[in-house]
């Protein structure tokens, strides 16, 4: 999620991102409402979320508990600049390579599967951006305010669930040893 500061408040867009060192690259449809905002105020906040899961108060041994949500997220903030056309094409190649590897054993998609004219036409419909990350902050809520036995109990219940978010949070809770992740 990319957030810019519009004249009437925040403007939000969902976009695939690539982070390398302190640089975050992404692209948006040229028609996206965030594009003129970033042109006028070239600074953005990117929010990347990890696994998350609902925690039932019934899972605690202690009485008088409330429901909660455990999660992992990272925020990156900094100035953005519009990429040149050749840089945007490279970004698309890099994004495809990054995500296509997870689809193996299918052969990865590359722009070589498109006619150059069609690729160029589609490239003209997007705007690529590069953010220089000046601030990077992570937030975790993994029940670290609870005693170790309660954390273990909640992690065990989450691990029994079928959704990836619950299982991911359970693994992080077990790995953090009750301290959170920083």
Report residues per predicted region.
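Catalytic micro-motifs at enzyme active sites that drive phosphoryl/nucleotidyl and oxygen chemistry
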Residues: 3-7, 34-35, 62-65, 118-119
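Short beta-strand segments
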Residues: 1-30, 46
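Pocket-edge structural micro-motifs
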Residues: 4, 28, 48-50, 133-135, ...
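Short, solvent-exposed polar/charged micro-motifs at secondary-structure junctions
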Residues: 11-15, 56-58, 120
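C-terminal edge-of-domain segments
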Residues: 81-182
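Short, structured beta-strand-loop surface elements
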Residues: 30-94
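Beta-strand secondary-structure signal
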Residues: 25, 45, 77, 128-132
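Residue-level preference for beta-strand/loop junctions
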Residues: 9-11, 72, 125
């Amino acid at each position: 999620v990319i957030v810019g500061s519009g004249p009437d408040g925040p403007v939000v867009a969902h976009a695939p991102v690539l982070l390398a060192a302190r640089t975050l690259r992404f692209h948006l449809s040229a028609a996206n409402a965030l594009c003129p905002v970033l042109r006028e105020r070239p600074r953005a906040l990117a929010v990347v979320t990890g696994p998350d899961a609902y925690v039932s108060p019934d899972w605690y041994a202690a009485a008088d508990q409330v429901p909660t949500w455990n999660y992992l997220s990272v925020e990156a903030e900094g100035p953005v600049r519009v990429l040149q056309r050749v840089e945007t094409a490279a970004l698309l190649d890099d994004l495809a390579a990054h995500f296509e590897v997870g689809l193996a054993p299918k052969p990865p998609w590359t722009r070589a599967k498109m006619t150059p004219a069609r690729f160029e036409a589609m490239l003209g419909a997007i705007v690529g951006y590069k953010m220089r990350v000046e601030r990077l902050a992570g937030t975790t809520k993994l029940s670290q305010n609870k005693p170790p036995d309660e954390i273990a109990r909640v992690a065990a219940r989450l691990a029994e669930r079928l959704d990836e978010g619950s299982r991911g949070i359970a693994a992080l809770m077990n790995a953090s040893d009750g301290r959170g992740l920083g």
